[in-house]
């Protein structure tokens, strides 16, 4: 009577067919023109957001006026939020796509290079948000009337009213 040795699935080197994810509905590959254009467009959007913040003097320290009237601040808030949302949507898509390669193949140098590039963009987006929150803190008295007027400012209002101290000190 012979007994066949039982194979432990946790220690077996035969993994069978490994799962594959089809991400071609997002981008066709890491080195495709469409992904490179998306990364380039993201850089352009983040640069434009920096220019927007500079042009409108949006920062905690750049505005010498202690408070700005709601009629002047609302279009600035809406403009910032529209631009940021557009950049964040693209950043999230590209970052998730690249991360799917890095997490499944840590030796993929193209994916690692793109991940590093995207990390720098992510830091810039965070710095822009800190700058914007600081400015929102300088106009906190105008926020209620700005939020009542609707639009992107109202849609995101709870983000900036729940933590007013953070907006002032960021």
Regions found by a protein language model. Give the residues of each.
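A well-structured
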Residues: 1-170
């Amino acid at each position: 009577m012979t007994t066949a040795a039982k194979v432990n699935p946790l220690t077996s080197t035969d993994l069978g067919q490994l799962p594959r994810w089809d991400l071609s509905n997002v981008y066709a590959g890491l080195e495709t023109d469409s992904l490179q254009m998306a990364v380039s467009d993201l850089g352009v959007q983040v640069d434009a957001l920096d220019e927007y913040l500079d042009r409108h003097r949006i920062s905690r320290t750049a505005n010498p006026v202690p408070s700005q009237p709601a009629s002047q601040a609302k279009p600035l808030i809406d403009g910032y939020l529209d631009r940021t949302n557009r950049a964040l949507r693209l950043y999230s898509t590209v970052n998730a796509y690249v991360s799917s390669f890095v997490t499944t193949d840590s030796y993929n140098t193209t994916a690692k290079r793109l991940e590093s590039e995207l990390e720098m963009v992510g830091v810039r987006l965070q710095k822009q948000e800190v700058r914007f929150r600081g400015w929102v803190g300088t106009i906190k008295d105008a926020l209620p009337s700005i939020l009542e007027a609707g639009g992107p400012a109202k849609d995101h209002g709870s983000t900036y009213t729940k933590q007013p101290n953070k907006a002032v000190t960021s």
